[in-house]
Amino acid sequence: EGHAIGIHTWSHTPGFPMLRSGAMAAGILRCRESLREITGVETDLFRPPYGVTNPMVARAVKRTGSRCVGWSIRSLDTLRQRSREAVARRIRRRLGDGKVILLHDDRPGAERLLAMVLNDLQRGGYRTATVCELFKTEKP
C-alpha cells in the first residue's frame, strides 16, 4: 500500500539517548526481531525516540546495521492544545520536495489529520513516497 515499515525501539524510554550503545542496540534488535516474527518484514529503518541522536545512538545504529531516519517537518501533533487544522496548516507552510513529515498514529483523530495532510499534498501537486524511495533503495 505504499508504506515502508521501520522500528522505533522496543520501549521508547525517555532516557534512550542516555543509554549505553549496547543497551540501545539490544532494544533495536529486539524490536526488529519481533517485527519480523509478526509481519515477516525485515527492516533496517530506525527512528530514535524524540529524534535525538548522539555518538551512542550512532554506535548502536552502526552496530545493528540500521539506517537512521529523521524528519524535516515536525508537525507538533503531540501537543494537546493544537487542533488538527492548526497541525495541517503548520505542515502546509513547510512543504517542499523530499520532506519527511513526523506524525503520530496514536493520537485521537490521527486518521482524519492524515487525510487532511494527504489532501493538501495532492492539491499542492506533491506525491507521497516511502523513505526507501527517498533513499533510493529497495530494502524496506
Where is each model-derived feature located?
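Metal-dependent polysaccharide deacetylase catalytic core of the NodB/CE4 family, i.e.
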Residues: E1-L102, D106
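C-terminal domain-boundary segment and adjacent tail
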Residues: G109-P140
